[in-house]
Amino acid sequence: MSFYDRQGIPEALLRDHPEEETAQQDQDRRDSNYQVWEDEDSASQSSTSDDTFEDDVLTLRDYSFISVNADGATFEMHRLVQLATRKWLKVHDQLEQWKQRFVSNLCAAFPTGDYENWAVCQALFPHAKSAAAQRPEREDSLRGWASLLYKAAWYAWQIGNGVEAESMSLHSIRTRKKILGPVFFMGG
């Protein structure tokens, strides 16, 4: 939560998102005996994960580190709490790990800037602006960060916010050039 904009943090962005399946997991899924065990484990893990998340939210709320909005699905976190949390993560060498999760979750949730996606984009745009100010260090995170900024720039351009669109698109292009190389952009 400490990386998002301090207001309107959607619950969906905070939950764990399953990683892509490996080839072994895909093969295991085809095995009917494995499937039965996996279904039972998945249901148990999902329930445990939901309970843990709810417990964590209650603890944070009880200590006034966060507040739950009236809709029950979005949160707020004071800037000083965000800053203190990021400092703690840095001291404990976890800052990049959590920044990567933040970028990954936000990139997965942020749609294209097409008109039909504007409501979702509008809700997530402040968080994309926050992400723009928090460039990750790891290359795998930078790819997602550049993609997020591209989608956010697209939305900003569509709604007529040229200044934000230009800034985000330039960050995205520069990052992609650094990762992919200038030849990629020259079409060669």
What are these regions (language model features)?
Residues 1-91, 96-104:
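C-terminal boundary/linker of central alpha/beta nucleotide-binding cores
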Residues 2, 99-171, 175:
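Extended alpha-helical scaffolding segments used for macromolecular assembly and cargo binding
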